[in-house]
From Swiss-Prot:
Lineage, highest ranks first: Eukaryota, Metazoa, Ecdysozoa, Nematoda, Chromadorea
Cell location: Cell membrane; Perikaryon
Organism annotation: Caenorhabditis elegans
Coiled coil, from the record: none
Name of this chain's protein: Proton myo-inositol cotransporter hmit-1.3
PANTHER family: PROTON MYO-INOSITOL COTRANSPORTER
Disulfides per UniProt: none
Lipid bilayer topology: Multi-pass membrane protein
Gene that this polypeptide is encoded by: hmit-1.3
Extracellular-side positions: 45-71, 121, 179-191, 303-320, 373-468, 527-535
Length: 604
């Protein structure tokens, strides 16, 4: 287990930390808000694709759209975001944090317009690729920019604002999706859903034309006067805090130059990270945090909220979207929990408690879908599949093997023809014209359904069950638990873990891990639901989160109360800390130094 005693104030630079927190003005909040619009765009895209994909498969020029194409269109964005996050690290070191954020807002605007105008599935895919690049840029650089441009006493709160805006984006996406679902949704409404994303992207672009670069980046690139001016605005004119931050940044930069001299010829920053044990350790821990966050299934729940609600037994698309508004609103409200507590109870405790809640509600989600499966109507015996039934129709043999409605409708090629009299049904294949309103053969074939409409009902994605509301209620508590800590804290911790010279590259790697596993989880959800059942899928996510809980308990340190540069020492061995202390003492040329007192008792 990690045990860390407090680092002496000012342990990084030798400058005594001011005894009282500064009063912050409007500027720092305006700066942080403008940056975390990137989080809003992240959340909006995650939420709007869930609503839009209820209608995109019916759009002229795009249909037919099978589950593989749907998974590609949904999942290409997180896949490309992984590439974008990796590229934005070196890019932000060279061009600056501000320019990368501006580039992200421009790319997002173009991507939203292309998605809205798409007349084929390929064009829609291109738009989704551009959105992925923009989100990758923003998800990596926004937490870094906010952490480097925030007063240390509210840094955790402001970085948590990134996650808050993700949840705001989710809420707005579902509201916009609900509103536009009444405007010819199959041809026009889904286009308006995608187009709306250009509005906040343009707002962010305009804001950043007037906002400064990160003071740490400015100092590192020799623009020390500008760095001091920006810090003066951030700290609202409190010169003792400005001097303290300048000393911290100066010491960190001197250490970077020393490290570069020691590792001359080692090549790119990533090679230096891998050859520096304590930074390598921090990057591995940070990357695993991001990986485990995605393996909890969160973005599966976000991307496929509509599918999950329909699977629970809600048939109407409008109702599905408005229920999504409620669930995303709970997610938004839950984000205020870490904002209120992150600087009081610390990152580590909040993360552990949140993960325990996620585990419990993943178990409950799995149980709820198991109950739905057991309660769904059974299929007739095979010998009863006689009336107008053609066993040679494509997928007929596969549909025939399913024993109940839930198993049947989970397969994308099958629907359930329910007998209102017998309280059983037939599992029948969809027709080749991609219609979901009737079966390709059997009693619910178009002509038969018309003649026998009062006796039979065709269900394409859901089953009648008395447990309909249960998964929806559990999903609300799952999202509340997740947003209370597991959502923001991997981002907060990764923004704090690394020294200045490694920060952009290490955060790029950890963010890429988030997006890669986002891609893996979202790309496999529909297929996994068919192979392992819906309830089995959530039990798998639960198992992954249990492993994550053990990992966090033993390997993730508390960073509350430390400056960004002090956090680096939490990952050092005792011998490395002694050497670091010696360098600190020598750098002050005999001046009295506060000693560094801490222990990092763990094996990694």
């Amino acid at each position: 287990m990690v045990q860390v005693a407090p680092v002496a104030a000012g342990a990084g630079s030798g400058q005594t930390r001011p005894s009282s927190d500064p009063k912050t003005g409007w500027f720092v909040y305006m700066l942080a808000f403008s940056a975390v619009i990137g989080g809003f765009l992240f959340g909006y895209d995650t939420g709007i694709v869930s609503a839009a994909m209820l209608y995109v498969p019916n759009a002229s020029g795009i249909k037919p759209l099978d589950s593989v194409w749907q998974e590609i269109i949904v999942s290409i964005t997180p896949g490309v975001a992984a590439i974008g996050s990796l590229c934005s690290g070196p890019g932000s070191d060279f061009l600056g944090r501000k320019k990368i954020i501006i580039g992200a807002s421009v790319t997002f605007t173009i991507g939203a317009i292309i998605c809205a105008a798409a007349w084929t599935k390929i064009i829609l895919l291109i738009g989704r690729i551009l959105l992925g690049l923009a989100i990758g840029f923003a998800s990596m650089i926004v937490p870094i920019y906010v952490s480097e441009a925030s007063p240390s006493h509210i840094r955790g709160k402001l970085v948590t604002g990134f996650q808050l805006m993700i949840t705001v984006g989710l809420v707005i996406a579902n509201i916009i999706g609900g509103a536009f679902s009444y405007v010819d949704p199959d041809q026009v409404g889904w286009r308006l859903m995608f187009a709306f994303a250009a509005v906040p992207a343009i707002i962010q672009f305009v804001c950043f034309l007037f906002l400064p670069e990160s003071p740490r980046w400015l100092y590192e690139h020799g623009r020390t006067v500008e760095a001091r001016e920006v810090l003066t605005r951030i700290y609202n004119g409190h010169t003792e805090w400005v001097d303290y931050e300048i000393n911290e940044i100066s010491f960190s930069y001197e250490e970077e130059l020393r490290a570069k001299a020691e590792h001359a010829g080692n090549g790119p920053t990533i090679i230096r990270i891998l050859k520096t044990p304590h930074v390598r350790k921090a990057m591995i821990i940070g990357s695993l945090l991001q990986m485990f966050q995605q393996l909890s299934g969160i973005n599966t729940v976000m991307y496929y909220t509509g599918n999950i609600i329909r699977s629970a037994g809600v048939k109407d698309n409008h109702t599905t979207i408005w229920i999504s508004v409620g669930t995303s609103a709970i997610n938004f409200l839950g984000t205020f929990i870490p904002i209120a507590l992150v600087e009081r109870v610390g990152r580590r405790v909040l993360l552990l408690v949140s993960m325990i809640g996620v585990i419990l509600f993943l178990i409950a989600m799995g149980v709820s879908f198991l109950l739905i499966n057991n309660d769904s109507l059974r299929t007739f015996d095979q010998q009863n599949y006689t009336l107008n039934y053609n066993p040679s129709v494509k997928h007929a043999a596969k549909c025939l093997k399913y024993s109940n409605c839930d198993f049947c409708v989970t397969d994308e090629n099958c629907g359930f023809c329910e007998s209102k009299v017998a309280k059983k049904g037939y599992c029948l294949p969809f027709p080749s014209d991609d219609s979901s309103d009737y079966s390709a053969t059997g009693i619910c074939e178009f002509s038969n359904l018309t003649n026998n409409g009062t006796d039979f009902e065709w269900e394409d994605t859901y089953c009648h069950t008395k447990f309909t509301v249960l998964p929806i209620i559990i999903m609300v508590f799952y999202l509340l638990s997740f947003s209370a800590g597991y959502a923001p804290l991997p981002w907060v911790l990764n923004a704090e873990f690394y020294p200045l010279w490694a920060r952009s590259t290490a955060v790029s790697v950890s963010t890429a891990c988030n997006w890669i596993f986002n891609l893996i989880v979202s790309l496999t959800f529909l297929s996994l639901s068919q192979a392992a059942t819906k309830y089995g899928t959530f039990f798998i996510y639960c198992g992954c989160t249990m492993v994550a809980l053990v990992f966090v308990f033993f390997f993730v340190p508390e960073t509350k109360g430390y400056s960004i540069d002090e956090v680096e020492m939490l990952f050092m061995t005792k011998e490395e800390r002694r050497k670091a202390q010696k360098v600190l003492d020598e750098s002050k040329e005999g001046k009295h130094r506060n000693s560094v007192a801490m222990s990092f008792d763990t094996k990694f």
